[in-house]
């Protein structure tokens, strides 16, 4: 049998996207919602310019396993730690033995890079390979990896007809068929105070993010140049709420095709920050975003149910807790400290 080779990925991510699609459709298709990676987005998110570390496994020249990551800073309490956000852990069903090799290579690399924690998302569905692998790994190697907390997503249905076909659970399909006009409703349409982000907004957006997350137990720590790279990247879009010449709110998101029983076009809200906005203005900013996306053929909007996202504004715009949740798992290194589940948090997770 040919030997498995673990090496750093070098490529344009097109083969990786095809690999993900083949494996994930086979494992999860029609069973649970999952994102479909875009090669251009992956090149930006985990490519060499991001500082990403991407070990992949090959057997006889065939891609059979992968894990990708990108560096960031995470404030936990009063201390800022270097962390690695991991994503795309995928192993071909016929070569599951490479999973532990990939994990070990990832752990060795983050240790060598001086990373305090590796952080990743795990599906909460007990029937999925993701859940089974990571819960077993945590039980077997408790000093290496642990599940720290559970959360989920907000979801807004903009095109119920598409979601009635694509829904995983019968109740999802029935709800979209029978309650479609209600589910797509937003209390407002476009708001004159909302406009696209401009480069001159960077300092204000950086300050709003810092202020908005200052009281969180866990929060991503953004440097201006890092935030600028995301806000100006063509894979993302950002809207700001400006009043009396001052930016008082921002929402940043990216397109995220999601696979259920069928493929739907979704948008993931990554960042929300505001300073000086009341409940009504937050509702209007989110309504504006939903209107903007609906007119561009987006079927659904999702966002992590984190402290960053204003729950009241989401409820007012008829977002609902999505049926599928997730766990946040953490890899430990020699620089790690003891962690307690955060009551309030903000993480980039996809």
Residue ranges and their predicted role:
Residues 1-58, 63, 84-85, 177-222, ...:
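Short amphipathic alpha-helix that is part of the acyltransferase structural core
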Residues 17, 21, 25-35, 77-85, ...:
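Extended intrinsically disordered, low-complexity coil regions enriched in Ser, Thr, Gly, Ala
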Residues 118-183, 237, 243, 249-350:
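Active-site/acyl-donor-binding loops of N-acyltransferases
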Residues 54-56, 62-72, 85, 246-257:
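Conserved beta-strand in the GNAT
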Residues 86, 95-110, 120, 278-291:
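Conserved acetyl-CoA-binding loop-helix of GNAT-fold acetyltransferases
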Residues 65-101:
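Long, hydrophobic/aromatic-enriched structural stretches that serve as scaffold segments
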Residues 40-56, 65, 139-144, 229-240, ...:
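A short helix-loop-beta-strand connector motif used in the catalytic cores of GNAT acetyltransferases and
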Residues 202-252:
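Non-catalytic interaction/regulatory modules that flank or connect domains
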């Amino acid at each position: 049998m040919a030997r498995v080779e673990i090496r750093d990925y070098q490529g344009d991510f097109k083969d990786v996207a095809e690999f993900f699609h083949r494996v994930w459709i086979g494992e999860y298709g029609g069973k649970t919602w999952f994102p479909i990676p875009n090669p251009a987005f992956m090149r930006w998110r985990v490519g060499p310019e991001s500082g990403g570390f991407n070990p992949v496994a090959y057997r006889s020249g065939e891609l059979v396993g992968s894990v990708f990551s990108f560096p960031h800073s995470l404030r936990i309490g009063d201390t800022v730690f270097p962390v690695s956000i991991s994503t795309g852990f995928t192993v071909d069903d016929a070569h599951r033995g490479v999973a532990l090799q990939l994990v070990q290579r990832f752990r060795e690399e983050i240790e060598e890079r001086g990373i305090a924690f590796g952080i990743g998302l795990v599906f909460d569905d007990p029937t999925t390979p993701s859940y089974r692998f990571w819960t077993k790994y945590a039980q077997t190697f408790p000093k290496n990896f642990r599940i720290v907390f559970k959360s989920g997503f907000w979801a807004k249905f903009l095109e119920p007809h598409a979601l009635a076909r694509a829904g995983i659970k019968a109740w999802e399909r029935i709800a979209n068929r029978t309650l479609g006009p209600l589910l797509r409703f937003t209390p407002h349409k476009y708001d004159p105070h909302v406009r696209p982000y401009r480069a001159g907004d960077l300092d204000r957006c950086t300050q709003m993010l810092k202020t908005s997350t200052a009281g969180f137990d866990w929060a991503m720590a953004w440097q201006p140049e890092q935030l600028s790279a995301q806000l100006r990247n063509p894979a993302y879009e950002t809207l700001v709420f400006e009043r009396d010449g001052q930016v008082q709110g921002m929402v940043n998101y990216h397109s995220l095709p999601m696979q259920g029983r069928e493929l739907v076009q979704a948008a993931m809200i990554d960042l929300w920050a505001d300073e000086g906005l009341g409940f009504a203005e937050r509702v209007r900013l989110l309504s504006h975003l939903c209107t903007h996306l609906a007119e561009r053929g987006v079927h659904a909007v999702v966002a992590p149910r984190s402290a960053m996202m204003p729950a009241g504004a989401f409820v007012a715009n008829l977002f609902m807790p999505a049926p599928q949740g997730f766990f946040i798992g953490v890899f430990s290194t020699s620089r790690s400290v003891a962690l307690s589940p955060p009551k309030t948090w903000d993480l980039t997770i996809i």
